[in-house]
Swiss-Prot record:
Record's function text: Participates actively in the response to hyperosmotic and heat shock by preventing the aggregation of stress-denatured proteins, in association with DnaK and GrpE. It is the nucleotide exchange factor for DnaK and may function as a thermosensor. Unfolded proteins bind initially to DnaJ; upon interaction with the DnaJ-bound protein, DnaK hydrolyzes its bound ATP, resulting in the formation of a stable complex. GrpE releases ADP from DnaK; ATP binding to DnaK triggers the release of the substrate protein, thus completing the reaction cycle.
Chain's gene name: grpE
Gene Ontology biological-process entries: protein folding
Entry-linked PROSITE patterns: GRPE
Stretches for region Disordered: 1-26
Protein's name in the database: Protein GrpE
Keywords per UniProt: Chaperone, Cytoplasm, Stress response
Alphabetized GO MF terms: adenyl-nucleotide exchange factor activity; protein homodimerization activity; protein-folding chaperone binding; unfolded protein binding
Membrane spanning residue stretches: none
Entry keyword Chaperone: yes
Superkingdom per UniProt: Bacteria
Organism phylogeny: Bacteria, Bacillati, Bacillota, Bacilli, Bacillales
Length: 188
């Protein structure tokens, strides 16, 4: 019996040792897996971050270049068209000088006054031209709604359809911008 007890004790001890070893192995495997997770955190994708940072930098540079270009163009336009307001105010003076020059007289005094008016008009027109003001050609030209304002349309045997036959008020451009369209009569 004693042998049986000893065998049972041995078996129990062996079983206990095997269980302890198994638990130790299980714990050790779990610890290793956890240790691996702790020791090797998910490596950040530095290449992707670098590529994203470079792309962001390129976008910012492009945005800044566009900003500088827009500001430069706006500054150029402000300088180019800075005289537009005063030119618009001076154009009625040119019209009035043209009307004054249409007066016909045999009187010598009136003729000398008209000569003076002609000189003033010529000087004013030269000054406007130096500022970039250009008279829009009208009579005999094809009607262009960007340059001309049709006031009258009449059938004409002398002109083709869509051709300006008369000008009621001169039109002007400042550089490439229309500041006043020509008021015209157009052939149908």
């Amino acid at each position: 019996m004693e042998e049986n007890k000893q065998n049972q004790n041995l078996n129990t001890e062996e079983t206990t040792e095997q269980q302890t070893e198994a638990e130790t192995v299980e714990v050790t495997e779990e610890e290793v897996v956890q240790a691996d997770l702790v020791e090797e955190p998910a490596a950040p994708d530095f290449e992707a971050q670098l590529a994203e940072a470079k792309a962001s930098e390129l976008r910012l540079r492009a945005d800044f270049d566009n900003f500088k270009r827009r500001n430069r163009i706006e500054a150029e336009n402000r300088a180019k068209y800075s005289s537009q307001t005063i030119v618009e105010k001076l154009l009625p003076l040119v019209d009035n000088l043209d009307r004054a020059l249409q007066i016909e007289s045999d009187n010598e005094e009136t003729k000398s006054v008209l000569a003076g008016v002609e000189m003033v008009k010529r000087q004013l027109v030269e000054t406007l031209q130096n500022e970039g003001v250009i008279e829009i050609p009208a009579v005999g030209e094809a009607f262009d709604p960007n340059l001309h304002q049709a006031v009258v349309q009449e059938p004409s045997e002398e002109h083709e359809s869509g051709v300006v036959t008369a000008e009621f008020q001169k039109g002007y451009k400042l550089h490439d911008r229309v500041i006043r369209p020509s008021m015209v009569k157009v052939a149908e």
